[in-house]
Amino acid sequence: MDVTIQHPWFKRALGPFYPSRLFDQFFGEGLFEYDLLPFLSSTISPYYRQSLFRTALDSGISEVRSDRDRFVILLDVKHFSPEDLTVKVLDDFVEIHGKHNERQDDHGYISREFHRRYRLPTAVDQSALSCSLSADGMLTFSGPKLVDPSHGERTIPVSREEKPSSAPSS
């Protein structure tokens, strides 16, 4: 069973006055007028309506999953190469830092930098952590959880007592 700790739709626009892109992870892509004042989006076009909900991959929001066997962080870093990224584990935290120097793109020159810090669950095996970058720019940081035999499934026998219970009956 996957349990999403930080669900992407939770931070989506909940109304017309919520700046949906303001807190998203668009590293250096810039904000537009309708991002800061979405009710004025008619200045761009009276027929344009920005979607209030986007997919997690489009928005760049990180996602943290923790299930019974595994801990996973998914992070959209499509504007960074593996050489631009640094992933460190410090005590009970994983720090992901990305930075690339100024480079030219279609609209001029741009530089990007971000820093993310996540707390690792105590049950994660820190000696078996791994990190990979997919071709479409998704960084996946994962690690297995330690198996604690004392917390496994066990059967508790039910004994029968001869005396009645002292608890009041309903």
Swiss-Prot record:
UniProt key word Nuclease: no
Transmembrane segments: none
Compositional bias per record (Basic and acidic residues), positions renumbered to this chain: 148-164
Annotated Gene3D superfamilies: 2.60.40.790
Glycosylation sites: S159
Modification comment: Acetylation at Lys-99 may increase chaperone activity. Undergoes age-dependent proteolytical cleavage at the C-terminus.
Deamidated asparagine sites (modified residues): N101
Segments of this protein annotated with the region Required for complex formation with BFSP1 and BFSP2: 1-63
GO molecular function, one term: structural constituent of eye lens
Function: Contributes to the transparency and refractive index of the lens. Acts as a chaperone, preventing aggregation of various proteins under a wide range of stress conditions. Required for the correct formation of lens intermediate filaments as part of a complex composed of BFSP1, BFSP2 and CRYAA.
Family statement drawn from the similarity comment of this UniProt entry: Belongs to the small heat shock protein (HSP20) family.
Subunit structure of this chain's protein: Heteromer composed of three CRYAA and one CRYAB subunits. Inter-subunit bridging via zinc ions enhances stability, which is crucial as there is no protein turn over in the lens. Can also form homodimers and homotetramers (dimers of dimers) which serve as the building blocks of homooligomers. Within homooligomers, the zinc-binding motif is created from residues of 3 different molecules. His-100 and Glu-102 from one molecule are ligands of the zinc ion, and His-107 and His-151 residues from additional molecules complete the site with tetrahedral coordination geometry.
Protein name per UniProt: Alpha-crystallin A chain
Organism: Tamandua mexicana (Northern Tamandua)
Protein encoded by which gene: CRYAA
